[in-house]
Amino acid sequence: MEPRLLMLGFLSLTIVPSCRAELCLYDPPEVPNATFKALSYKNGTILNCECKRGFRRLKELVYMRCLGNSWSSNCQCTSNSHDKSRKQVTAQLEHQKEQQTTTDMQKPTQSMHQENLTGHCREPPPWKHEDSKRIYHFVEGQSVHYECIPGYKALQRGPAISICKMKCGKTGWTQPQLTCVDEREHHRFLASEESQGSRNSSPESETSCPITTTDFPQPTETTAMTETFVLTMEYKVAVASCLFLLISILLLSGLTWQHRWRKSRRTI
């Protein structure tokens, strides 16, 4: 019995740290009149299982994680109400709104094609009674692509991409080189943008770590608290599990040794 317990404790201590991925502390930067989307998701990416109003997620399915080329689990939402008829009517109305919202969100990103790379996951399929907004926790190396919303055109001198990178010991997103302006005033902004581009053509230096960083936007308190909570809770549970296993192993070893010692004394 002891060798099996020792092996279980050893596996727990070695597997838990190996699953760790460096999460991006903040959300990707927002660009006015533009939306961003990931073409694929790197290993370790976490998606919260959020449910719309009137529904709640199952306790054992708090989030789903990208592992290999697929997501670790499927989110599920259950109703808070026991009224069957009211639940059906509400679900139908919410489903119609959800379909419209999903269609509107997909319009500006129709020209984007999802990558099919090893170690990446595609966009997770929607689950029943899902919230209209998805909350992702990206990992280092993740890139997101930006596009202007309908009615706006892009003014850019560089790629409309933001990448989560490690800089000076902290993770942060690069600033996308994209400005979205009204289609009716696009020609005016284009002329002024060309004149400014000739004056401000010096590339940014990425070799040194300045004291005050301007590349990465400051997060809101709510975003920081949410992402820190997911990260700390996950590792607190892992550490507590390892400690529990170690204590159990020590107790079982002590009891076994005591039993053998008493048995040996009786034989003497």
Swiss-Prot record:
Keywords: Disulfide bond, Glycoprotein, Immunity, Membrane, Receptor, Repeat, Signal, Sushi, Transmembrane, Transmembrane helix. Residues 22-236 are extracellular. Its main location: membrane. It comes from the Eukaryota. Residues 86-109, 189-219 are annotated as: Disordered. GO terms for molecular function: interleukin-2 binding; interleukin-2 receptor activity. It is found in: Membrane. The chain crosses the membrane at residues 237-257. Residues 258-268 are cytoplasmic. The keyword Electron transport does not apply. Glycans are attached at residues 33, 43, 116. Residues 88-109, 193-211 have a biased composition (Polar residues). InterPro entries: IL-2_rcpt_alpha (IPR015486), Sushi/SCR/CCP_sf (IPR035976), Sushi_SCR_CCP_dom (IPR000436). Pfam families: Sushi (PF00084). GO terms for cellular component: external side of plasma membrane. It is a single-pass type I membrane protein. Non-covalent dimer of an alpha and a beta subunit. IL2R exists in 3 different forms: a high affinity dimer, an intermediate affinity monomer (beta subunit), and a low affinity monomer (alpha subunit). The high and intermediate affinity forms also associate with a gamma subunit. This is Interleukin-2 receptor subunit alpha. It comes from Mus musculus (Mouse).
